[in-house]
């Protein structure tokens, strides 16, 4: 396909998750999309070269195998380098498109075309199980102190109560669509986060020049933390690390000082105490290493 004919580029990062990735690609084909598109898979340092196995099943896909895990942002950035579509749709490999995806995704692209001041969209995100349960229907801003926010609709049954288009402060990393020209202007994802908070930081950067929206006219299914696991040491390390980095990069003046004090000396130590009492020493170690790594990163870039 000539690169000028491609309307949409799906960008998918795979890490030891070939089963989920194949299921996602199956859902793309089953949706019988009515617009030109390409599927890009970045195998981000899997133990085996899973890209070649995926390519054998679906010869038309594009992508590559990278022998080092570059993290969520780094993998997506490799996809950006390859993609030629007018719009980039970043979707986690543990998501599934619905059968209605053709019309819904076309609607997202039309909305972005008609509103050039919009920098990105995230659709309604539903859990794979239980059925019809919301994961994401927009979000509140992050607290300036705790660096936490609320995902609207989380855990609720989808009864149409979040079917209103709304401006949001942050895109959801499991599913976000951006025009290529927006990325050309603001740059690629900040790869130093490796995992977690990179889409929040990117959203802050995009939001300085554009507006971001929750787009309920489209939806996707997400299996949640199939790739990292709930409360895994990996997840604990990077959440503890990256909250500190995000605060240092995006909070200003006294807000930054108070946020860092809270994250390190209040929330950080309280988390450590809880994990100690619970006897979760592996998670405790990951948490403390994460905080130490975050503090070290901040000191290096001062």
Regions found by a protein language model. Name each.
Residues 1-30:
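N-proximal low-complexity "stem/linker" segments adjacent to membrane-targeting elements
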Residues 18, 27, 43-51, 68:
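A conserved acidic beta->alpha catalytic loop
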Residues 65-83, 93, 99:
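Glycine-rich, basic loop-to-helix element that forms the pyrophosphate-binding segment
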Residues 88:
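Short aromatic/hydrophobic "clamp" motif used to bind/position activated sugar donors
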Residues 96-136:
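Conserved donor NDP-sugar-binding/catalytic core segment of glycosyltransferases
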Residues 141-168:
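Short, flexible, basic/aromatic active-site loop/helix in glycosyltransferases
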Residues 169-219:
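A short, conserved alpha-helix in the catalytic core of glycosyltransferases
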Residues 234-242, 253-302:
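Non-catalytic, C-terminal membrane-associated alpha-helical segments of glycosyltransferases
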């Amino acid at each position: 396909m000539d690169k000028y004919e491609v309307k949409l580029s799906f960008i998918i990062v795979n890490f030891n998750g070939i089963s989920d990735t194949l299921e996602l690609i199956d859902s793309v084909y089953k949706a019988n999309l009515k617009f030109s598109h390409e599927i890009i898979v970045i195998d981000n340092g899997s133990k085996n070269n899973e890209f070649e196995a995926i390519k054998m099943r679906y010869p038309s896909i594009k992508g590559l195998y990278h022998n080092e895990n570059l993290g969520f942002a780094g993998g997506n950035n490799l996809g950006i380098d390859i993609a030629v579509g007018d719009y980039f749709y970043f979707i986690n490999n543990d998501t599934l498109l619905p059968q209605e995806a053709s019309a819904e995704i076309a609607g997202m692209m039309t909305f972005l075309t008609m509103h050039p001041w919009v920098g990105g969209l995230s659709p309604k995100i539903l859990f794979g199980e239980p059925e019809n349960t919301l994961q994401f229907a927009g979000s509140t801003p992050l607290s300036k102190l705790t660096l936490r926010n609320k995902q609207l609709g989380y855990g609720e049954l989808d009864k149409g109560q979040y079917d209103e288009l709304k401006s949001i402060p942050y895109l959801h990393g499991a599913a976000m669509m951006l025009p290529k020209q927006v990325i050309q202007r603001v740059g690629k994802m900040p790869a130093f986060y490796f995992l977690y908070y990179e889409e929040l930081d990117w959203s802050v950067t995009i939001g300085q020049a554009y507006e971001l929206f929750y787009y309920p006219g489209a939806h996707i299914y997400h299996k949640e933390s199939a790739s990292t696991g709930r409360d895994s040491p990996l997840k604990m390390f990077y959440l503890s690390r990256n909250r500190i980095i995000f605060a240092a990069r995006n909070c200003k003046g006294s807000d930054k000082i108070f946020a860092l004090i809270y994250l390190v000396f209040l929330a950080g130590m309280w988390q450590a105490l809880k994990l100690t009492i619970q006897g979760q020493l592996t998670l405790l170690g990951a948490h403390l290493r994460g905080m130490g790594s975050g503090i070290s990163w901040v000191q290096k870039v001062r």
